[in-house]
């Protein structure tokens, strides 16, 4: 492993600290808790939506979450290892066959729905143990 890759891994470890980032993929519905600073106050804001893209680039990894807010589509890009992210919770697994779901931008209503991924019984028992 070259020196830059080693430094990047150390920086990722430092950025994560105590946090753990769950496995998620495009099509999954996630709740991203973001630390927001307003003047002197610091609060946590929850942003819930569908992951439409994930970019794996080591320390520069990011993902885009899309949600419908009062009838208007809103997309937000998050840096995976940002110190502003408080937590990421996977609410629902989506069953999609694409890595980038940009086609959802053109769709609304029922055509923008994503099928839920069903987990086999033997796979379901393993994570609980």
From Swiss-Prot:
Database matches in Pfam families: Ribosomal_L19 (PF01245)
InterPro entries: Ribosomal_bL19, Ribosomal_bL19_CS, Ribosomal_bL19_sf, Translation_prot_SH3-like_sf
The family this protein is said to belong to: Belongs to the bacterial ribosomal protein bL19 family.
Name of protein: Large ribosomal subunit protein bL19
GO annotation (BP), single: translation
Assigned keywords, A-Z: Ribonucleoprotein, Ribosomal protein
Source organism (scientific name): Paraburkholderia phytofirmans (strain DSM 17436 / LMG 22146 / PsJN) (Burkholderia phytofirmans)
One GO CC term on file: cytosolic large ribosomal subunit
Gene symbol of the encoding locus: rplS
Annotated function: This protein is located at the 30S-50S ribosomal subunit interface and may play a role in the structure and function of the aminoacyl-tRNA binding site.
The keyword Ribonucleoprotein appears for this protein: yes
GO-annotated molecular function: structural constituent of ribosome
């Amino acid at each position: 492993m070259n020196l830059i890759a080693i430094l990047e891994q150390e920086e990722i470890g430092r950025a994560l600290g105590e946090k753990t980032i769950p496995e998620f993929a495009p099509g999954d519905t996630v709740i991203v808790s973001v630390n927001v600073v307003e003047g002197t106050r610091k609060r946590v804001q929850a942003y819930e939506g569908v992951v439409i893209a994930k970019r794996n680039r080591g320390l520069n990894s990011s993902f885009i979450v899309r949600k419908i807010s009062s009838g208007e589509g809103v997309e937000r890009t998050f840096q995976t290892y940002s110190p502003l992210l408080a937590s990421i919770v996977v609410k629902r697994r989506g069953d999609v066959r694409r890595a980038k779901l940009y086609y959802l931008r053109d769709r609304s209503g029922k055509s923008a729905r994503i099928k839920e991924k069903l987990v086999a019984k033997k796979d379901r028992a393993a994570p609980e143990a």
